[in-house]
């Protein structure tokens, strides 16, 4: 993880060769002039040649332009269309810029006049962009250094450090989520995922584990039906952060299918390797709880994750089975690859009954249909509460994690009615992301609830400004921002 140090020293001192990143909204100002002077005019010449105007997406890279400067990267931050520079624009610019650095372990980042208040946001973008899941690479090149330390030049170190503390916490939550999603399924399965969660007790979180026996006694028939085909036994893990006195908790629920073969309704071989990511909702919840604990959030929050592996075997659940959920409702299982909703059915109803939360937000890589609807830029938002949906959407916009609210209603809900049980776990293909949400809604009662379908945003095959290809950690920052509005001091 990239180490961030806020320093008040001049960014362009020539005491040692230094790589410098400058985030700017114009090719002018005192900071730009100081860098140009240190480079003996090389910066201004390059800017003129490239037509750099400080616009978002623009960059200039100069290798060793002068003594004392090993590299210079200029990155524009000014949004197109005349919009004001904001934290998201700074994060994205910093993320792009640090990726342009070549072969350095340490760099200085500075911001042009009027942008210094965004220095912690720049550090966040740089840290998230520099993430690399390299745990299993045995041949790591020693000839190509990787950026390890970023010195961020500011005039008020104390103010920057104060604001960075919360961003540091959430960045570690995002990285934890990315790490969990990236792990191979032979390493991360319900028992080992549980062990990773239990390590968070050292942050002050309370962790409770329900094993197969406990869930059987409680009547988690829907979740246990999914798990019965695997040699890896299921777990439900409850993580609590108590920072809000006697207030009712906010509850966050995650789907944790550590590998999804589809069960007897088996998936095609192509792309099945990515089904290790089907625990992305649970990973996001755990990353969030880590962030709340690290920044000592003034709120009561509960994270509940249902952890299973959906496999094919002689003991696997069959299409046509009927299972009884925790709350007593019966479900006709017509497709064993629609398993995430079965896991969430028990976890949602259990959380509602046991903890009486103020609200519930569940996250799941639930449907391929949401990817068809929204692509890879926005997660689907379904809710029974306009106020909750609005709060989540505003939080997402603030941190650059987009949500798009989808319709719900009785016309969709009745498609789930079964002839021989209370409901079936699938309807027709049209609107199937909505039908999945309607299924979940049957288990939340009158509690304010939202479902985030993150199937298109939890894992990407192309890099973004602040995330390499692979696990994104989508949702941790969004929910952390959402929680802030509910804290005691808010």
UniProtKB/Swiss-Prot annotation:
Assigned keywords, A-Z: Aminopeptidase, Cytoplasm, Hydrolase, Manganese, Metal-binding, Protease
SUPFAM superfamilies linked: Macro domain-like, Zn-dependent exopeptidases
Coarse class of the protein's main subcellular location: cytoplasm
UniProt-annotated catalytic positions: 267, 341
Cysteine pairs bridged by disulfides in the record: none
EC number(s) stated in the UniProt entry for this protein: 3.4.11.1, 3.4.11.10
Chain sites annotated for binding Mn(2+) 2: 255, 260, 278, 339
Cofactor note: Binds 2 manganese ions per subunit.
Cofactor: Mn(2+)
Reactions accelerated catalytically: Release of an N-terminal amino acid, Xaa-|-Yaa-, in which Xaa is preferably Leu, but may be other amino acids including Pro although not Arg or Lys, and Yaa may be Pro. Amino acid amides and methyl esters are also readily hydrolyzed, but rates on arylamides are exceedingly low; Release of an N-terminal amino acid, preferentially leucine, but not glutamic or aspartic acids
Cellular component terms (Gene Ontology): cytoplasm
Binding positions (Mn(2+) 1): 260, 337, 339
BP term (GO), one: proteolysis
Cited InterPro entries: Leucine_aapep/pepB, Macro_dom-like, Peptidase_M17_C, Peptidase_M17_leu_NH2_pept, Peptidase_M17_N
Compartments, record wording: Cytoplasm
Superkingdom in the source lineage: Bacteria
Gene3D superfamilies linked to this entry: Leucine Aminopeptidase, subunit E, domain 1, Zn peptidases
Listed Pfam families: Peptidase_M17, Peptidase_M17_N
GO molecular function per UniProt: manganese ion binding; metalloaminopeptidase activity
HAMAP family (alphabetical): Cytosol_peptidase_M17 (MF_00181)
Protein family membership: Belongs to the peptidase M17 family.
Protein name: Probable cytosol aminopeptidase
């Amino acid at each position: 993880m990239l180490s961030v140090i806020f320093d008040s020293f001049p960014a362009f001192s020539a005491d040692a060769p230094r790589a410098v990143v400058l985030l700017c909204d114009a090719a002018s100002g005192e900071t730009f002039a100081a860098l140009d002077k240190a480079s003996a005019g090389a910066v201004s010449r390059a800017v003129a040649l490239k037509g750099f105007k400080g616009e978002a997406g623009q960059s200039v890279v100069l290798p060793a332009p002068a003594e004392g400067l090993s590299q210079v990267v200029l990155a524009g931050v000014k949004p197109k269309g005349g919009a004001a520079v904001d934290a998201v624009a700074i994060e994205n610019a910093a993320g792009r810029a640090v990726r342009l650095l070549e072969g350095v372990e340490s760099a200085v980042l500075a911001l042009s006049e009027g942008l210094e208040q965004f220095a912690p946001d720049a550090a966040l973008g740089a840290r998230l962009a520099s993430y690399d899941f390299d745990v299993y690479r045995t041949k790591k090149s020693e000839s190509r250094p990787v950026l390890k330390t970023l010195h961020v030049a500011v005039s008020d170190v104390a103010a920057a450090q104060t604001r960075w503390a919360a961003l540091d916490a959430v960045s570690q939550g995002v990285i934890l989520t990315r790490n969990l999603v990236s792990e191979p399924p032979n390493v991360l399965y319900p028992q080992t995922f549980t062990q990773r969660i239990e390590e968070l007790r050292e942050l002050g979180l309370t962790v409770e584990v329900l094993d197969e026996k406990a869930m059987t006694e409680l009547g988690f028939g829907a979740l246990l039906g999914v798990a019965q085909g695997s040699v890896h036994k299921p777990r439900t893990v409850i993580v609590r952060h108590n920072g809000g006195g006697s207030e009712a908790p906010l509850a966050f629920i995650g789907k944790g299918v550590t590998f999804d073969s589809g069960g007897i309704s088996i998936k095609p071989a192509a792309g099945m390797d990515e089904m290790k990511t089907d625990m992305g909702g649970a990973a996001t919840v755990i990353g969030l709880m880590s962030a709340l604990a690290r920044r000592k959030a003034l709120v009561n929050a509960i994270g509940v994750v249902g952890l299973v592996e959906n496999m094919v075997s002689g003991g696997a659940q069959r299409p046509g089975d009927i299972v009884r959920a925790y709350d007593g409702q019966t479900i006709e299982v017509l497709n064993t690859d629609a398993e995430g909703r079965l896991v969430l059915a028990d976890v949602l109803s259990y959380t509602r009954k046991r903890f009486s939360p103020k609200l519930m937000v569940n996250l799941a890589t639930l449907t391929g249909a949401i990817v068809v609807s929204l692509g890879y830029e926005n997660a689907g938002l379904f809710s029974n509460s306009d106020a909750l949906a609005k709060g989540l959407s505003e939080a997402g916009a603030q941190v650059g994690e987009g949500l798009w609210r989808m319709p719900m209603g009785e016309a969709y809900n009745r498609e789930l009615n079964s002839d021989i049980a209370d409901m079936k776990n699938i309807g027709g293909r049209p609107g199937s992301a909505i039908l999945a949400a309607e299924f979940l809604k049957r288990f939340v009662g009158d509690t304010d609830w939202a479902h985030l379908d993150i199937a298109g945003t939890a894992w990407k095959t192309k890099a973004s400004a602040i995330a390499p290809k692979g696990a994104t950690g989508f949702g941790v920052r969004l929910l952390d921002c959402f929680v802030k509005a509910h804290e005691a001091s808010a």
